[in-house]
């Protein structure tokens, strides 16, 4: 890499050298030499040396079974260590200017206050921001939690290395710690022996909060307060919470039979338990800190003029938190303890009121400096996390709710709900929603699947509203899908109005989303229920799998525009929930860019976004990194609200309509209409083998017997990223752009790319995907794994990809992909010589296991390690 990345290169070199020493100690010198030889051959092969490529393939094919696992592990761990070094580089004091952008919030405040936006308007926007980041597990984080903790410790060592004041002895101790950690990593199994349970996934999410976000939230808000005070002279309120966190881990039952009402209850208890435990740590520290005697009259009266009034209040809180933890421990162990609710932290105010009193007393007694330390941090954590830590969303497929009502109407002799038309369904549902008598008879014994849905809504009814987020209905298409859930909640005795959120996923459903919501607003009962606000979820993964990325992106944009219009006309506040994945094929990409490319008026200070699997670690895994990510989200939502992008010109819309139409035709011509496509996909990728990898808790398919359409978006993307063709992230888009160029529209496309954030984002995402893709490697998989009679399809796909790259370079008037983002390009180029050998070995091992039907345990484990290694190198799974 170039000199501007010298510190990154140095860290990668140090970690690589220690890993090499570890391998030499565990294996031997000849084995390490072989790894180095293959690495050098991979580099030469990248530069077009065919002899080096042949030598590398010969060496890989000759690896004995006992060397397969350590070989795959060596390259896998190098890539993980390179990721750590790169992640650390973005927060390092030696970070170069191309990588470390200035603080986005500070920049935005400067731009806004230089005459463009009124100060009061800016402050009002900041204080009413409602950004909800929803942690999900299903793409799935491929690294084990035990390894992630070790990776964090490696980062601590890298940070220590930057301290210029270290003595020689301290440097040696730090280097020894680094060697110990890398040895621990080497000797730890990277592949789980069993799939994680939904509870395991929820615990992983909680560990991210404990390890990083718990510290990052007060750090970020302190930084934000300083920036605002510096520019406006005003302080932010102590309870400001521009960003909060929700979760799907333990609440998302769509296609996951392992998420039951019992599991959801356990996760809710674990969330509360973690919050209570972390607040207890804060209170223990505050007992030590707040030893002062001076207080305001309110606090002195409450504590009988105690000499240590702050400690009196804090000791009582400390005991309540300990009792709460004991109570939740008993519940998690399966007991039903009887308790006096007054002795527990049961509501947010049980913590907020006493802490606010202490804060007020300190500030009124001239001790603001003390008040604005740990006490303010705790108040801000409370405003962000509450006493439940994460608000748990519930998600279920629309058909599962319909099945409940259908089974019930058949039992009651009313006919079959599933066979009624939409008008009949709505009439029945509204009649029951408006009525007072219960619909479900006491003596009814429903089927197991229906009983599980009923158990879930009853669980919701028993919870505090602040423990839960939204009820998301996947594959929603009609108003009756929403009304059905509302009726089930009513029947369960739910006293609080829960947000019921339709998720529009397919191309057709996205196109009909606005008319569905408009029909709901036309119902008086529903208008009364929603109380002036509506949340709608936009699905990115399934729409892209259904129609390709270009057509899906335009459908998502158009759906949002229409939803904004419908809600504005009805005078209802719209919150859009973006179900993005980590990868481009699932709507992923830089969050800041993505938010600023939304239609004008669609953000308006409110947004929900899923943060998925491995992206949670990349964005929030370290406190300083998390502060950066929180600042990016805050600045993007403020900018999209106060300085929205321009409305697209009519000719841009027309061009996008043509691009969407051409791209979906090209995409479906392959994925749906090409008779050999499924056979090619199964042969050319490790899709079948991925099903054996113990990743997330959720099955890879919605239906066991289904084809591509039943395959979840995540394994669909994961499989294509393994053989480096990256097909879902570009298929259809390049062909549509080429057709536009052939029509003489290149000048128009350039104008769109330069002036329209939505289109510029689409093109830059395409560039990134093309840069990560490796058609020559995909061809090697084909040679090893695909029957000769299907090779024509691979040739056609690679030809389409070449066309796409050519037209994107013409459009951007660039000589090379990602020339305007050198950091990203360097990052890809750094990894390639380490990913390539894993890809070549993976193809070899796939061929072996498929030929022999039952491979040795060494071969199977090595194959799993290559899958994990390629995922680490590509920095995405699904």
Swiss-Prot record:
InterPro entries: PEP_COase, PEP_COase_bac/pln-type, PEP_COase_Lys_AS, PEPCASE_His_AS, Pyrv/PenolPyrv_kinase-like_dom. One of its GO terms (cellular component) is cytosol. Its EC number is 4.1.1.31. Its cofactor is Mg(2+). The active site is at 138, 545. Keywords: Carbon dioxide fixation, Lyase, Magnesium. GO terms for biological process: carbon fixation; oxaloacetate metabolic process; tricarboxylic acid cycle. It comes from the Bacteria. It catalyses: oxaloacetate + phosphate = phosphoenolpyruvate + hydrogencarbonate. The keyword Magnesium applies. GO terms for molecular function: magnesium ion binding; phosphoenolpyruvate carboxylase activity. Forms oxaloacetate, a four-carbon dicarboxylic acid source for the tricarboxylic acid cycle. HAMAP family: PEPcase_type1 (MF_00595). Belongs to the PEPCase type 1 family. This is Phosphoenolpyruvate carboxylase. It comes from Shewanella loihica (strain ATCC BAA-1088 / PV-4). The lineage of its organism: Bacteria, Pseudomonadati, Pseudomonadota, Gammaproteobacteria, Alteromonadales. The gene is ppc.
């Amino acid at each position: 890499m170039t000199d501007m990345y010298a510190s990154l290169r140095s860290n990668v070199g140090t970690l690589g050298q220690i890993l090499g020493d570890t391998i030499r100690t565990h294996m031997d010198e000849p084995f390490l030499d072989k790894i180095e030889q293959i690495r050098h051959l991979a580099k030469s092969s990248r530069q077009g040396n065919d002899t080096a490529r042949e030598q590398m393939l010969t060496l890989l094919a000759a690896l004995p079974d006992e060397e397969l696992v350590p070989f795959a592990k060596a390259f896998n761990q190098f890539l993980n260590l390179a990721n750590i070094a790169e992640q650390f580089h973005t927060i390092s004091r030696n970070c170069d200017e191309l990588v470390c952008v200035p603080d986005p919030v500070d920049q935005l405040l400067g731009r806004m206050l230089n005459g463009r936006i009124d100060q009061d308007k800016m402050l009002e926007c900041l204080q009413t921001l409602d950004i909800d980041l929803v942690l999900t597990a299903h793409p799935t984080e491929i690294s084990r939690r035990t390894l992630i903790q070790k990776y964090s410790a490696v980062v601590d060592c890298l940070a220590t290395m930057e301290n210029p004041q270290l003595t020689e002895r301290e440097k040696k101790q730090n280097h020894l710690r680094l060697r110990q950690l890398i040895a621990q990593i080497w000797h730890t199994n990277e592949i789980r022996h069993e799939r994680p349970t939904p509870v395991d996934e929820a615990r992983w999410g909680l560990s991210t909060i404990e390890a990083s976000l718990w510290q990052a939230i007060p750090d970020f808000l302190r930084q934000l307060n300083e920036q605002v005070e510096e520019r406006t002279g005003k302080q932010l309120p102590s309870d400001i919470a521009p960003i909060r966190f929700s979760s799907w881990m333990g609440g998302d039952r769509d296609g996951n039979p392992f998420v039951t009402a019992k599991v959801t209850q356990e996760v809710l208890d674990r969330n509360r338990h973690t919050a209570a435990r972390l607040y207890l740590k804060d209170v223990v520290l505050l007992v030590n800190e707040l030893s002062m005697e001076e207080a305001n009259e309110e606090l002195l009266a409450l504590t009988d003029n105690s000499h240590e009034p702050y400690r009196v209040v804090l000791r009582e809180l400390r005991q309540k938190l300990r009792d709460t933890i004991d109570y939740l421990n008993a519940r998690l162990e399966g007991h039903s303890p009887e308790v006096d609710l007054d002795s527990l932290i049961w509501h947010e105010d049980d913590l907020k009121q006493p802490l606010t009193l202490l804060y007020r007393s300190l500030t009124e007694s001239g001790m603001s400096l003390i008040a604005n330390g740990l006490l303010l941090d705790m108040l801000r954590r409370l405003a962000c996390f509450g006493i439940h830590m994460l608000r748990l969303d519930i998600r279920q497929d629309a058909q599962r709710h319909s099945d409940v009502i259908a089974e019930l109407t058949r039992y009651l002799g009313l006919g079959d709900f599933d066979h009624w038309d939409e008008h009949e369904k709505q009439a029945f549902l509204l009649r029951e929603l408006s009525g007072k008598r219960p619909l479900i008879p006491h003596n009814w014994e429903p089927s197991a699947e229906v009983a599980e849905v009923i158990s879930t809504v009853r669980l919701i009814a028993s919870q505090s509203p602040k423990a839960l987020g939204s009820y998301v209905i996947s594959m929603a298409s009609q108003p009756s899908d929403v009304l059905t859930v509302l009726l089930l909640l009513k029947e369960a005795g739910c006293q609080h109005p829960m947000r019921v959120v339709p998720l529009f996923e397919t191309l057709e459903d996205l196109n009909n989303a606005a008319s569905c919501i408009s029909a709901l607003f036309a119902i008086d009962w529903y208008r009364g229920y929603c109380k002036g606000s509506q949340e709608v979820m936009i699905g990115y993964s399934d729409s892209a799998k259904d129609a390709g990325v270009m057509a899906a992106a335009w459908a998502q944009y158009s759906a949002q525009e229409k939803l904004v219009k419908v809600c504005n006309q009805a005078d209802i506040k719209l919150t859009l929930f973006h179900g993005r994945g980590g990868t481009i094929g699932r709507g992923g990409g830089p969050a800041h860019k993505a938010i600023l490319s939304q239609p004008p008026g669609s953000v308006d200070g409110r947004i929900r976004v899923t943060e998925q699997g491995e992206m949670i670690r990349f964005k929030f895994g370290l406190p300083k990194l998390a502060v950066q990510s929180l600042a990016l989200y805050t600045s993007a939502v403020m900018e999209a609200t106060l300085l929205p992008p321009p409305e697209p010109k009519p000719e841009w819309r027309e061009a996008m309509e043509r691009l969407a139409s051409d791209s979906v035709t090209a995409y479906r011509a392959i994925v749906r209409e090409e008779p050999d496509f499924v056979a090619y996909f199964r042969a050319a990728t490790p899709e079948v083998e991925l099903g054996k990898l113990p990743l997330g808790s959720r099955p890879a398919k919605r239906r066991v017997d289904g084809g591509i359409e039943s395959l979840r978006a995540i394994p669909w993307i994961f499989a294509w990223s393994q053989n480096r063709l990256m097909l879902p992230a570009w298929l259809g888009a390049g062909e549509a752009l080429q057709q536009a160029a052939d029509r003489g529209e290149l000048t128009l496309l350039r104008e769109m790319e330069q002036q329209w954030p939505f289109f510029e984002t689409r093109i830059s995402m395409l560039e990134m995907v093309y840069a990560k893709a490796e058609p020559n490697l995909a061809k090697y998989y084909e040679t090893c794994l695909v029957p000769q009679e299907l090779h024509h399809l691979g040739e056609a796909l690679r030809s389409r990809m070449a066309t796409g790259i050519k037209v994107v370079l013409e459009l951007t008037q660039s000589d090379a992909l990602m020339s305007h983002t050198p950091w990203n390009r360097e990052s890809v180029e750094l990894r390639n010589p380490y990913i390539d050998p894993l890809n070549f070995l993976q193809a070899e091992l796939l061929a072996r296991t498929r030929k022999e039907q039952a491979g040795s345990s060494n071969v199977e484990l090595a194959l799993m390690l290559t899958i994990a290694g390629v995922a680490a190198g590509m920095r995405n799974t699904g």
